[in-house]
């Protein structure tokens, strides 16, 4: 059985931001529990990047708009024969609940911004080697606290993002499920099509080909060029089959 590699590419700025936030939140939990300096730096670096992303746009506003848009889309299925009405109504209620929690939550990331340890580490992350024990004695002593005490603090930090995480997960799940994968074929390593107001491209490609896509475009039109991983000896077949979903 062939191994398929999934590539996702945003077709607008809001989706680009959402995917970056999703990625960074996932990275926060990869190396938990924090048991050493390397794990701590991985965690705090991702927290810092997450706060940087929050400061660049109206994340809450865009998510609330999308939660409302998804509710309106689901409401068009109410009363349609053959559609699981209880499932539709449950999703609408979940979207409403996520929106209510998000709109009443404090400023996104504010709890993390105000934490003294996070602020101290953020100041040193841009300096090469700037998180040594003599630069950050606060972090050094924190790493020697009882594991349970560190775990509790990390859980509190991550929990402060729950209103955002819950809303973002629902929105991205619905967008990803909004379009099926369809077989497409590129000619001489190139494929282009209309986006149909899509927010996100999802592309399944066989690992056997050892190719990756370079995608450009926006919601109304996009182009994909397939490139060999081995730039010197790799080849792109004249015809290449892949699966594509415009979500």
Curated annotation (Swiss-Prot):
One BP term from GO: division septum assembly
A Pfam match: ZapD
One example GO MF annotation: identical protein binding
Localization per record: Cytoplasm
Family matches, as SUPFAM superfamilies: YacF-like (SSF160950)
InterPro entries: ZapD, ZapD_C, ZapD_sf
Record's signal peptide: none
Domain of life assignment: Bacteria
Keywords of the record: Cell cycle, Cell division, Cytoplasm, Septation
One GO CC annotation: cell division site
Effect of loss of the gene: Mutants are viable, with no discernible division phenotypes.
NCBIfam families according to UniProt: PRK05287.1-1 (NF003653), PRK05287.1-3 (NF003655)
Known partners and oligomeric status: Mostly homodimer in solution. Interacts with the C-terminal tail of FtsZ.
Family: Belongs to the ZapD family.
Stated role: Cell division factor that enhances FtsZ-ring assembly. Directly interacts with FtsZ and promotes bundling of FtsZ protofilaments, with a reduction in FtsZ GTPase activity.
Protein name per the record: Cell division protein ZapD
Biological source species: Escherichia coli (strain K12)
Taxonomy of the source species: Bacteria, Pseudomonadati, Pseudomonadota, Gammaproteobacteria, Enterobacterales
Name of encoding gene: zapD
């Amino acid at each position: 059985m062939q191994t398929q590699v999934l590539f996702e590419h945003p077709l607008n700025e809001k989706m680009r931001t959402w995917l970056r936030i999703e990625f960074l939140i996932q990275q926060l939990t990869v190396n938990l529990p924090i048991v050493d300096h390397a794990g701590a730096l991985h965690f705090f670096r991702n927290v810092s990047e997450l706060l940087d992303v929050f400061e660049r746009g109206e994340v809450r506003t865009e998510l609330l708009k999308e939660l409302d848009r998804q509710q309106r889309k689901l409401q068009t299925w109410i009363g349609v024969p053959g559609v699981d009405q209880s499932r539709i109504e449950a999703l609408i209620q979940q979207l409403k609940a996520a929106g209510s929690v998000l709109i009443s939550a404090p400023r996104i990331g504010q709890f993390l911004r105000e934490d003294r340890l996070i602020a101290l580490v953020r100041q040193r992350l841009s300096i090469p080697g700037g998180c040594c024990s003599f630069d950050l004695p606060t972090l050094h002593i924190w790493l020697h606290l009882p594991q349970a005490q560190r775990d509790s603090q990390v859980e509190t930090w991550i929990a402060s993002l729950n209103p955002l995480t819950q809303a973002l997960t629902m929105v991205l799940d619905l967008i990803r499920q909004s379009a099926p994968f369809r077989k497409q074929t590129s000619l001489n390593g190139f494929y282009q099509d209309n986006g149909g107001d899509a927010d996100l491209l999802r592309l399944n490609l066989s690992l056997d080909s050892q190719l990756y896509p370079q995608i450009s475009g926006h919601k109304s039109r996009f182009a994909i060029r397939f490139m060999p991983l081995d730039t010197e000896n790799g080849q792109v077949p004249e015809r290449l089959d892949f699966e594509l979903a415009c979500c």
